[in-house]
């Protein structure tokens, strides 16, 4: 098991890519904290994961990723329980498909606060401990639309472009301190979040996929 006894926090871990990541990490022997938007969602995810991995060590937390104080408080609980934090997966994110001419400041802030500020808050909460241990991994979930853009909902690709820049900068700064910082950029993926995206937005994206499917 490649991650045996490693301690990982996965934001947005209650569904979609985050839940699949938690499942994979547990299968590889990691101890996992699933961070979700609510205590109810976190507990539901933990219950599902324990049904798959009865002997696994997995807990749920529900930080407000827009608040550093909330994130630090919840992450400290994980560190207190497991002794350290080895891996942070910044996966939580929100997307929408509002045309630019209908965008409001509140729409923009909602996306940026979670997708960009949330990455800062979560990473800032763990990095001191990782530096002290001269070891750690930060993995950010970006998106292919950070490169290609998309025809509606401009704030999502803009936020993921910011994640790319954050990843590169932190990799340069933290690498000499023993911390690896990387990003993955999935294409359009069939998750719960995509159910809210209209067909007229999804279909042109699917047309660009060689297999013509999600």
Language model segments and positions:
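Conserved glycine-rich cofactor-binding loop
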Residues: 7, 14-16, 38
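The beta1-alpha1 cofactor-binding region of Rossmann-like NAD(H)/NADP(H)-dependent oxidoreductases
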Residues: 39, 62-73, 105
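Active-site loop immediately N-terminal to the catalytic Tyr-X3-Lys motif
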Residues: 98-101, 148-154, 176-177, 212
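Substrate-binding pocket helix/loop in short-chain dehydrogenase/reductase
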Residues: 99-100, 104-112, 194, 202-205
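Active-site helix of classical SDR
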Residues: 123, 159, 167
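Alpha-helical segment proximal to the catalytic Tyr-Lys
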Residues: 128, 172-176
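Residue(s) in the substrate-gating loop at a strand-loop-helix junction
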Residues: 143
């Amino acid at each position: 098991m490649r991650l045996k006894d490693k301690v990982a926090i996965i934001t947005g871990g209650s569904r979609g890519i985050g839940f699949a990541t938690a499942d994979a990490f547990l299968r590889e022997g990691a101890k996992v904290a699933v961070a979700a938007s609510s205590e109810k969602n976190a507990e539901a995810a933990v219950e599902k994961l324990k049904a798959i991995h009865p002997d696994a060590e997995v807990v749920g937390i529900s930080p407000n990723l827009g608040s550093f104080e909330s994130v630090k408080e919840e992450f400290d609980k994980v560190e207190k329980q497991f002794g350290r934090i080895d891996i942070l997966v910044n996966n939580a994110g929100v997307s929408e498909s509002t045309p630019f001419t209908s965008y409001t400041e509140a729409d923009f802030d909602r996306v940026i606060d979670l997708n960009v500020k949330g990455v800062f808050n979560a990473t800032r909460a763990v990095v001191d401990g990782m530096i002290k241990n001269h070891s750690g991994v930060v993995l950010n979930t970006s998106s292919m639309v950070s490169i290609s853009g998309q025809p509606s909902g401009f704030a999502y690709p803009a936020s993921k472009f910011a994640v790319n820049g954050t990843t590169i900068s932190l990799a340069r700064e933290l690498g000499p301190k023993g911390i690896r910082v990387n990003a993955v950029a999935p294409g359009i993926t069939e998750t719960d979040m995509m159910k809210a995206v209209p067909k007229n937005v999804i279909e042109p994206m699917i047309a660009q996929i060689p297999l013509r499917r999600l």
